[in-house]
């Protein structure tokens, strides 16, 4: 009996040990084949950013697991533990993001870019790229969902998609350019007061939101634009209140003329040599010369 047990133990020790799968991230869309042969049955497809398990190699083929076990050609993936993996993943995401931006209808490529960014953050959170990757992935997803929302007749009816990832950027990466960018994008969630042309008081509320943002992020990457957004709205309010009709109000006209002059001067002082400072100066010039600003066809959702 003792000899039998020793024999069984020796057999178990000599049995090939199952190696854990090496985790990797796909960098491009790749077909999965049932065998290491490009003419064999296709089992599915791996999308950029998907995490795969590398099992084995056979010539130019790699056996992977991604929901199903199969074979892919080439080396369009990077192991998560490879040196510089974060830079490679970020580079692939940035390339796809640029491609998607050149064709706004290409939502699949944009989703692939977002997946790469978000998995970089999720699997390599200590990377110097992690904060930016989380922001860029979250921003792409939020913008895609925003584009899917039906157009609302009035600002009061606006509905916004889930912003939890954007909020995660703001909370986890405080005082970074990525938090500043995320918070600027989410300012529009506050713009549900009403239509500018029936409720011009709502313009003042939007001005306040932009000015509060600039106070919070005085040197942020979006601060000059936010300061201009406020001046532009002040110019629009001046235009609406100065025109003949039921909304004409000389007191409000004078008030907004002063605000445009003061805030455009501050914009020029705080953010010199920027397009936003120059555009603010143009608004101030138009108001000073009693030249109404061109009114938009409808109340915009953020921005100038």
Model-derived features: positions:
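Sec-dependent N-terminal signal peptides
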Residues: 3-13
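Cleaved targeting-peptide boundary
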Residues: 14-24
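Boundary regions of SH3-family modules and the immediately adjacent low-complexity/disordered segments
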Residues: 20, 36, 41-44, 51-53, ...
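Extracytoplasmic
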Residues: 27-29, 47, 59-61, 67, ...
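Short, structured beta-strand/loop micro-motifs enriched in basic residues and often containing a Trp
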Residues: 28-37
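Short solvent-exposed coil/turn linkers within tandem alpha-helical repeat scaffolds
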Residues: 39-40, 107, 120-132, 168-183, ...
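Amphipathic alpha-helical repeat scaffolds of TPR domains
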Residues: 84-102, 128-150, 175-194, 221-244, ...
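Short coil/linker segments at helix-helix boundaries
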Residues: 99-111, 143-168, 191-209, 236-268
